[in-house]
Amino acid sequence: IEVLFSDKRPFFTENQSIFDDALVKNESVFYTRRIGGPRDDNGAAGDIEAAVKVIGSAGPVNYGLFAAREDDADEVGRSYYAGRFVIPRGKWLLGTQTTYTERPFRNRTALVNAFNYDIKPGEVWRLVGQFMRSDIDTDSGDSSGLGSFNAIQYLPNDRWQFEFSLLHYDDTLDVNDMGYLRRNDLAEWYLSAVHDWTDFPEDSRTASVSMRAFATRPSNTDGVRLMDNISVMLGQNMRSGSDISLRINASLAGYDDLISRGHGLVYLKNRFNGGLTYSTPKRGAWRKSVGVEVIQEGYEGWGMGLQAGLTWYPYEKLNLDFSLQPRQSRDWLIWIVDEERLGSYSRRNITGRVTANWFPAERHEVRLNAQWLTIDAEGRQGY
């Protein structure tokens, strides 16, 4: 699965909300990091020759128009176009978005159309959804794909929130020329419940408690059942400024159709993961956190990890974060491309991070970040 990165370039972040149609977390037909991303010919960063964005309204319609062109767009650069139209009303919203991408080096064009809705039939109910179609034109042939997401939300009060959704992506749906989709070939239902407790007496050490519970049942479009997932997260905020969080996750036995990189299905047993984290209140110029986790990431082995964090506030507008996360696992399961088989490794790794955040003036921020990772792994078993 491709890694998703957020965009930091002001032109692609300011006044960009009109193009936001992401109903499934982080997924959208317009992903600005594509523009100026790795070139099709050599993988180096593409240079942007020009870009323009127009945002406005005409009567009841809000609109956004976008176009960008990379250098050498006639040969290796790419051209991007997007149009978004939204009709908002008090109890409902309808929107459409169309993107078009030209990639001459690959002799490829991609047209994506999306339609989304947001309807509030009552005070406690909400219906949201999106339908997508992709049309890809290449020298080797044309393809089209469909996708849909529909959800119903129930919010009886400000403490409870429930959601049930259905998702279906064809195995030919492809929006990633200009958008971001974690994967296609997926049919999934999702159920979540959120509850917040805030009515603690004033003399209680607890300020609030939150609970998040999620369950998913995925399969691919061939009907192969993938691993079901159940997660529960609890968080407790104390009046002193400290907080405690607990996470429990279970991935139930099923198939993984991605880990082998297209070489077949892999059946995995139940996997369980959990973690507990505690953060102290700020005392003087320091705040600390500690955590422990138990993991299963392979076929049958267990592992564990620790986390230690320290934040230093030398003065109000500057803070420095230090964190260290050692982890050891007896069963790190990965696909070995050259050997076309799975390998189980005994792994030890340490992740470290140092971050400095400085706010010299209003609307000004300077951030420096250093991160490193060390891994020592020994092969145990091949499959």
For the regions a language model picked out, list residue spans one by one.
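Exposed, low-structure sequence patches enriched in small/polar residues
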Residues: 47, 132-383
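Outer-membrane beta-barrel channel domains
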Residues: 1-217, 248-256, 281, 292-295
